[in-house]
């Protein structure tokens, strides 16, 4: 399995999940597709990118992170629970 860092720099595009793939569309045209399980990180550079909840859940479920940027500088990170705490703590 290969891991990729995906940069989304196209302003006004939308990210959706279809059959395990992250799909990027703009103006009704598909710009690209990649298997969510192959991602280690998604870097959102464009400020007007629409992301579906299924994409958030899919990326985080596969232990990847999402980095949010403004003016091409990181301003926040979405991280899966497995990277923020030990699950054994909440099981007991």
Where are these regions (language model features)?
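N-terminal intrinsically disordered, cationic/polar leader segments
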Residues: 1-92
């Amino acid at each position: 399995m290969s891991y990729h860092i995906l940069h989304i720099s196209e302003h006004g595009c939308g990210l959706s999940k279809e059959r395990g793939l992250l799909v990027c569309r703009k103006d009704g045209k598909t710009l690209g597709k990649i298997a969510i399980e192959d991602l280690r990180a998604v870097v959102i550079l464009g400020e007007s990118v629409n992301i579906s909840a299924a994409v958030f859940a899919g990326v985080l479920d596969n232990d990847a992170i999402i980095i949010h940027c403004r003016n091409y500088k990181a301003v926040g990170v979405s991280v899966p629970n497995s990277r923020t705490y030990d699950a054994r703590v909440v099981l007991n």
